């Protein structure tokens, strides 16, 4: 008997040919079930915000300060200070953020997991996190990895003489990788022009991506596809930083400020570097990129393959970056690893060596550094910063704070004693509650007033959904709080049907004014609250029409933001290109509509059952954009019935595509051939996809009406309150 046949288990659960292998285009619902309690080791009642409030932040920072200059033999500190390494670690933790879908960023501590922990741009950051383990171990659950990575970057800056803008905790850890689209390439650092390239046309970067190559945070420091052209590189810099919410001034400040510290590493050829952490052997214990070049560390370190130290004070804040940038002419050269970089012509040796105090080097720069001089717009900003060091320091402090906090959402989530007092426009500020809130009696009276206006169930539900469904669980932006649906740009979005929306808002504002004017104790209802309350009234009326009495939960406390408190450009990225819940597609896309529905559901933090019940309910409530009849599988719209599911699953109906793109379908009576319904891919997927059909069967059963209403109300209430961090 062979050794193989002696083993009772030749294969284990999860191995073998998968459904994805057989049907690569099958709709993937797994993204809706990430980060559940099943992967979370914390106790069910663990509250990270409360745990962080108990943390002695000053003590943690003191330990981090000590760590900065406590060099370890197993991974020595450049210049005797880990500051540069930890700035890079924090930057790369936050720098995956992108505005298009709000994904990436520092929240969750995703740098610990694949693929980020093994990206070529993150070489050696495995060592940075391992250096932090004794401190994380010491403070345990009271500080997450996500918060610690950013705090360490701040302390690194402070330990090198820089005054930061502030720090906020509140990033709870996740315990498994996010399922994020990072690109279609199959090779790390694959150049543009390949079969899976993220570029089309004249270097047009695919949305929602915000990096130029697979495995990079932003740009290739050698230039586009390794071409050492600073002007061409400026195009890539501007594109990628803009997609991370940074303007030109913030971009210059971040590059110059970050490159004031530390160095890059390219002591020898990349062929000496071993596999990344996810591919390394068990004995490496989660570390990767083991190098056989010399000692493999210290002066022999290979990270990016570039060997650049920008300033004469790499462990101290200074204006040296700009001084060197503008004081010298630059000559193209190569690092010991063969990477393109630049050296100052006719310059003296003024740059210290990281490990030999007797050695000095000429100033060096990256291709992307020189972009700050040779791109006209960047050059103008760079010279201003060079001539005004205090302005540069302030710009870097603010840009660094934005970089490291952009994905945290509103200030209500900020924790700790170092939260800056200043409110910033990119935080989507909302005024604090400054009046008594409505009570249960007021809620009941306002619902009656709303229903008496003559606004339909469809109008009430559509408006509330449009207001709340801008929320993104990725970066915690959007939502009903602030009532920004009445402001530019949201009021003008096609999906919100501007003319119809304006009429509904005008009516609700009349109800709001009448109520507020009648109060004698200062009590008020905000329009943000009233929009949600009106939606609740519509849902309750629709349930009543179905013969079921139910109360939709409601918690007052939302406030109305002003146009001045709204960054129109930053808010524009929240405009949905698709909203399957309203059967809306802005344009034709390569991605199927049903996949865009799942993507939207994931951003709304919905599960597959929640997504299913919401689609079925919103269809019969008439929430489709443009009053489209696609998917309205009922003869009693405005009634919260399970008709969508019952009629979709009816075998008396035969479906056929009626559009060339197979995106619109007719359902005909099998016996008579008469058209009964029309639907989109988003509608029919609930009968076609085996998992979604199983869910549809639950809600389409004869005994499901009450459960359907109850589940719809629960999912509806969840969406209405996604941005209510004040209730947590």
Curated annotation (Swiss-Prot):
It catalyses: H2O2 + AH2 = A + 2 H2O; 2 H2O2 = O2 + 2 H2O. Bifunctional enzyme with both catalase and broad-spectrum peroxidase activity. The lineage of its organism: Bacteria, Pseudomonadati, Pseudomonadota, Betaproteobacteria, Burkholderiales. Homodimer or homotetramer. NCBIfam families: cat_per_HPI, PRK15061.1. Keywords: Heme, Hydrogen peroxide, Iron, Metal-binding, Oxidoreductase, Peroxidase. Its EC number is 1.11.1.21. This is Catalase-peroxidase 1. InterPro entries: Catalase_peroxidase, Haem_peroxidase, Haem_peroxidase_sf, Peroxidases_AS, Peroxidases_heam-ligand_BS.
């Amino acid at each position: 008997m062979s050794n193989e046949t002696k083993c009772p288990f030749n294969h284990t659960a999860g191995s073998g040919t998968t459904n994805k292998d057989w049907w690569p285009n099958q709709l993937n619902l797994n993204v809706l079930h990430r980060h559940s309690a099943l992967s979370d080791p914390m106790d069910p009642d663990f509250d990270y915000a409360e745990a962080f409030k108990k943390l002695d932040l000053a003590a943690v920072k003191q330990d981090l300060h000590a760590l900065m200059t406590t060099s370890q033999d197993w991974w020595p500190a450049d210049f005797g200070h880990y500051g540069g390494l930890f700035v890079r670690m924090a930057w790369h933790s936050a720098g995956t953020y992108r505005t298009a879908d709000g994904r990436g960023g520092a929240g969750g501590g995703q740098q610990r997991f694949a693929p980020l922990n093994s990206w070529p741009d993150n070489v050696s950051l495995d060592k940075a996190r391992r250096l932090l383990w004794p401190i994380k171990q010491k403070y345990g659950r009271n500080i997450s990895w996500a918060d610690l990575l950013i705090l360490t970057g701040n302390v690194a800056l402070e330990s090198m003489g820089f005054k930061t803008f502030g720090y906020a905790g509140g990033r709870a850890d996740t315990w498994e990788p996010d399922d994020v689209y990072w690109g279609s390439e199959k090779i790390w650092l694959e150049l543009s022009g390949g079969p899976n390239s993220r570029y089309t046309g004249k270097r047009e970067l695919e949305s929602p991506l915000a990096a130029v190559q697979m495995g990079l945070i932003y740009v290739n420091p050698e230039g586009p596809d390794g071409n050492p052209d600073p002007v061409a590189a400026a195009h890539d810099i501007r594109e990628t930083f803009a997609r991370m919410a940074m303007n030109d001034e913030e971009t210059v400040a971040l590059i110059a400020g970050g490159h004031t510290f530390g160095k890059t590493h390219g002591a020898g050829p990349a062929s000496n570097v071993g596999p990344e952490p996810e591919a390394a052997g068990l004995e490496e214990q989660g570390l990767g990129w083991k190098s056989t070049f010399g000692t493999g560390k210290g002066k022999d370190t290979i990270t990016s393959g570039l060997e650049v130290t920008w300033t004469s004070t790499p462990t101290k804040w200074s204006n040296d970056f700009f001084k060197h940038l503008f004081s010298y002419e630059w000559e193209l050269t190569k690092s010991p690893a063969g990477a393109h970089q630049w050296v100052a012509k006719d310059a003296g040796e003024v740059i210290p060596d990281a490990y030999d105090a007797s050695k000095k080097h000429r100033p060096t720069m990256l291709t992307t550094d020189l972009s700050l001089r040779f791109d006209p717009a960047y050059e103008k900003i760079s010279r201003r910063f060079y001539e005004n060091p205090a302005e540069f320091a302030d710009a870097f402090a603010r840009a660094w704070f934005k970089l490291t906090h952009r994905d945290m959402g509103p200030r209500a989530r900020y924790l700790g004693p170092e939260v800056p007092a200043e409110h910033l426009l990119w935080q989507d500020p909302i005024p604090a509650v400054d009046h008594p809130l409505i009570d249960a009696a007021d809620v009941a009276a306002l619902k009656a007033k709303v229903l008496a206006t003559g606004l339909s169930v469809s109008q009430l539900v559509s408006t509330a959904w449009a207001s709340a469904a801008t929320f993104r669980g990725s970066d915690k932006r959007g939502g009903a709080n602030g009532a920004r649906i009445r402001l530019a740009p949201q009021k003008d979005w096609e999906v919100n049907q501007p003319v119809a929306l304006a009429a509904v808002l005008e009516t609700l504002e009349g109800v709001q004014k009448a109520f507020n004017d009648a109060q004698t104790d200062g009590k008020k209802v905000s329009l943000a609250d009233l929009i949600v309350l009106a939606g609740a009234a519509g849902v309750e009326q629709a349930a009543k029409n179905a013969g079921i009495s139910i109360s939709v939960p409601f918690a007052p406390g939302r406030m109305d933001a002003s146009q001045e408190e709204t960054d129109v450009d930053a808010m524009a990225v929240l405009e949905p290109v698709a909203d399957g819940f309203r059967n809306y597609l802005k344009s034709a896309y390569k991605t199927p509509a049903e996949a865009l529905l799942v993507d939207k559901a994931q951003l709304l933090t919905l599960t597959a059952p929640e997504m299913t019940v919401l689609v079925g309910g919103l269809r019969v409530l008439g929430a489709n954009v443009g009053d489209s009849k696609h998917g309205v599988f009922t003869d009693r719209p405005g009634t919260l019935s399970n008709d969508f599911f019952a009629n979709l699953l009816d075998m008396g109906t035969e479906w056929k595509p009626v559009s060339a793109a197979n995106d619109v379908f007719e359902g005909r009576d099998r016996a008579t051939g008469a058209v009964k319904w029309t639907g989109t891919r988003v509608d029919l997927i609930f009968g076609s996809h085996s998992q979604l059909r199983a869910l549809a069967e639950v809600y389409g059963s004869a005994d499901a009406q009450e459960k359907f209403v109850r589940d719809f109300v629960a999912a509806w209430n969840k969406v209405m309150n996604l941005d209510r961090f004040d209730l947590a």
